């Protein structure tokens, strides 16, 4: 096959017409290609999946996929990379800010060593319908009766809670004068509870069943208190590195579409439909606590929202 550039060196008696043809052809090759002729590069989302317990992870991942699918027509294809490294909360946030290893991450707050909230977009959309802060109490099954008799904050303060060191719940519980035993690894909490190192493990009503289920048999069986829960305002948001504004814009657009067409509600019901059945029994005494990590105004707003949405299904008792 003749090299088209070699035509430029043809003898003069053949050159002028062919040279004009080649120049026109080369000029056309240099024109920009339209979006219809060349597909745009896919959105590359590097999603950190280890920030929460197994009771929330499946829903959170499916929600990210839903938001990306809802915007496929407007924003094109995507590549979703799951980052499941065992990182501390602060390290995962720092990596998210850089936007290289991780660029998308669920979080309840953005603080910690070497962490700067100015480096992420916090999408304002509701993720868990105000129920993340409604904490079921996972206890040893042989101590369920001890938690049947808790009706006031000072009664719960006689027991010790267990928490992971870098969770925001630690500051909330300690602020409300609830004794807390800490560990750096979430996987240590259940064996510690079984060994009487502390008395209860407060986890969201959404995740507690999945977390306790593998430990609900045998002499050291764990169970969820059917009579006592606590609530403190704790919202979860999808956060995106400010190095990736297009991802933040796309996920925000996906939230709008999925909220309007009801698909977020359907996804929530798929994963957490059991909560409505549980609340309908109207047996839970729920102790209301304040969250010192947010403003008094925000505390008041979120507590009022919880009471409005779920108050008819639970007996609420305010902290002293």
What kind of region is each of these model predictions?
Residues 50, 130-136, 140-143, 213-252, ...:
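Periplasmic-binding protein-like
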């Amino acid at each position: 096959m003749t090299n088209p550039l070699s035509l430029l060196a043809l003898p003069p008696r053949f050159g002028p017409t062919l040279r004009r043809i080649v120049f026109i052809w080369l000029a056309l090759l240099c024109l920009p290609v339209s979006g219809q002729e060349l597909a745009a590069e896919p959105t590359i989302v590097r999603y950190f999946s280890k920030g929460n317990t197994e009771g929330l992870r499946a829903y959170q991942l499916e929600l990210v996929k839903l938001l990306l699918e809802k915007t496929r027509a407007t924003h094109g294809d995507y590549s979703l990379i799951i980052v499941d490294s065992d990182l501390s909360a602060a390290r995962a946030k720092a990596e998210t800010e850089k936007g290289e290893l991780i660029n998308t991450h669920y979080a309840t707050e953005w603080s910690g060593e070497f962490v700067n909230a100015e480096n992420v977009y916090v999408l304002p959309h509701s993720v868990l319908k105000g129920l993340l802060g409604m904490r079921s109490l996972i206890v040893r099954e042989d101590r369920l009766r001890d938690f049947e008799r808790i009706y006031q904050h000072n009664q719960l303060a006689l027991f010790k809670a267990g928490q992971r060191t870098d969770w925001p719940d630690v500051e909330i519980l300690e602020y409300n004068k609830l004794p807390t035993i800490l560990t750096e690894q979430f996987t240590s909490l259940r064996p510690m509870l079984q060994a009487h190192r502390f008395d209860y493990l407060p986890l969201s009503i959404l995740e507690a069943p999945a977390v306790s289920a593998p430990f609900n048999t045998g002499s050291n069986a764990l169970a969820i208190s059917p009579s006592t829960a606590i609530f403190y305002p704790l919202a979860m948001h999808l956060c995106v590195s400010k190095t990736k504004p297009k991802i933040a814009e796309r996920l925000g657009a996906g939230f709008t579409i999925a909220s309007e067409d009801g698909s977020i509600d359907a996804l929530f019901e798929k994963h957490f439909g059991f909560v409505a059945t549980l609340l309908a029994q109207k047996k839970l005494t729920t102790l209301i606590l304040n969250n010192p990590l947010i403003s008094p105004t925000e505390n008041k707003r979120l507590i009022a929202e919880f009471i409005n949405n779920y108050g008819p299904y639970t007996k609420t008792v305010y902290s002293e």
